[in-house]
């Protein structure tokens, strides 16, 4: 069975990058630089959402279903820098050649990882294989790779369920809850910068982990819908997630399970 890797990232404004591009003096604080960037962006677009190349990755969380095991974790440690996080993510793809699954990964997560990985000089040979690589199965990647929108090595659930129409897309939180799963708890993407400024990187990683579990559970329901899991197999897979989380002691999993009806 091909391993499945579900992933999600959390980002903050790349203050250092914006400072360098706009020649902001060193004496201006990071918080002030961020406010300048937000103001500039609002004037341009009406939103303070930063362009993807100026989104600095502070957390990458994953669910890996491989063999008999299921695990959820955040890549690296609290002390790891952006380059280390991104390299570790691509190293996981190098190791497992998994099917990767995301929610809006094609529209946000992967382009951010492309830009930021390029800036930091990371290596991602397996990920970028389009059929001309040196791997034994590289020829297969000409027809099914991680990059092409309509291939299956990367399943962007949001994009696929919306039939590749941005106006038809649904929010993960709402869809997860409608499917009977907990959805978001206590934080969303708009709160990440404030939490980061308050030194709450651990809480950001916890939030990212719950989001990636929501994505995985919705993916299981999708696999049942498309006939890849029969009802019994679907029930077993959902039970594996619940049982694994029940055995974990962290507070965010206790909160998550409390919001998940039996």
Predicted regions and their residues:
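Generic detection of intrinsically disordered/low-complexity segments and helix-coil linkers/edges
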Residues: 12, 43, 201, 247-250, ...
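Charged, low-complexity, helix-prone segments enriched in Lys/Glu/Asp/Gln
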Residues: 22, 31-46, 208, 222, ...
């Amino acid at each position: 069975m091909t391993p499945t890797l579900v992933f999600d990232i959390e980002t903050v404004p790349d203050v250092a990058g914006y400072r360098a591009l706009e020649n902001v003096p060193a004496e201006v604080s990071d918080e002030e630089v961020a406010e300048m960037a937000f103001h500039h962006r609002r004037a341009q677009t009406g939103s303070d959402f930063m362009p993807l190349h100026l989104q600095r990755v502070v957390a990458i969380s994953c669910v890996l279903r491989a063999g008999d095991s299921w695990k959820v974790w955040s890549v690296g440690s609290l002390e790891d820098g952006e380059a280390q996080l991104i390299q570790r993510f691509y190293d996981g793809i190098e190791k497992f050649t998994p099917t990767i699954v995301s929610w809006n990964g094609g529209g946000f997560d992967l382009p951010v990882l492309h830009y930021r990985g390029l800036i930091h000089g990371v290596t991602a040979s397996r990920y970028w294989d389009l059929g001309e690589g040196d791997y034994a199965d590289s020829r297969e990647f000409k027809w099914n790779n991680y990059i092409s929108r309509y291939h299956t090595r990367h399943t962007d659930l949001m994009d696929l369920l919306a039939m590749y129409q941005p106006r038809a897309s649904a929010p993960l939180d709402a869809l997860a809850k409608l499917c009977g799963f907990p959805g978001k708890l206590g934080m969303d993407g708009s709160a990440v910068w404030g939490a980061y400024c308050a030194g709450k990187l651990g809480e950001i990683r916890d939030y990212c982990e719950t989001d990636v579990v929501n994505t995985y559970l919705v993916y299981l329901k999708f696999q049942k819908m498309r006939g890849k899991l029969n009802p019994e197999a679907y029930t077993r897979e959902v039970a594996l997630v619940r049982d694994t989380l029940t055995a974990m002691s962290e507070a965010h999993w206790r909160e998550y399970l409390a919001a998940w009806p039996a």
